[in-house]
Amino acid sequence: NYRIFAPEIPDQIDFAGEPAPLHLVTVREKLDRELLINTYWHTSTLTLMKRANRYFPMIESILREHNIPDDFKYLALVESRLENVISPRGATGFWQFLKETAREYGLEVNLEVDERYDPEKSTVAACEYLKKAFSEYQNWTLVAASYNGGNRRIGEAVEEQNTTDYYELWLNEETSRYIYRILAVKTIFQNPTRYGFYLTPSDLYPEIPSEEIRVEKDIPDLMAFADSLGIFRLILNKIKPL
């Protein structure tokens, strides 16, 4: 008989070295909710595991270079599923930058170039945001929450509610779930078989080999450009989305 089991809630867990207070019933239940969703939404979680193998090494390297905790790679996973998606508000790329914020943190965004689509450059820009936010909050959990809820809103919530503890703050639905979503994904990724996910190395998506090509003029037809270099069109579009 096919049986469905409740996913195991870990005895302890932390985000960026900052422990989550799992002894509190509300905290355990919120984490349980996200573990249930990610454990039994098999197609989604399996796809994320496969895709992370392609992009996590690059993200981890840049995070280390900028002294950002490794757990922030899961933030990118939750933000965009490591895809160059566009939100209804226009947030774009792995790290879901709005145009104004992207420019503020050094990304070129105009009619011809949009570096939000560049996984490496956008990761560097995200690190700059995270470092600036940490200089204000001195708390990585609040930094992650501010990435979702906005620096101003989190700052106002901290001041009005007189606490710097994310787990005590009253926030909107999305931001109040945000850290728990990250913790759930982290828990499953670190213990996949415990949650029923079995993957072999051959199941994982490999890195797409690439090289930098400098051009001296505009490229009016990217598909023709791909053909001229003998590059598979869909591969080029994945690296440089239209």
Can you describe what each PLM-predicted range is?
Residues 175-195, 231:
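Catalytic cores of secreted or luminal carbohydrate-active enzymes
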Residues 10, 67-73, 77, 92, ...:
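Extracytoplasmic
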Residues 90-111, 123-125, 130, 154-157:
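Substrate-binding/active-site groove segments that recognize
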Residues 130-157:
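Catalytic and binding regions of secreted/periplasmic enzymes and modules that target cell-wall glycans
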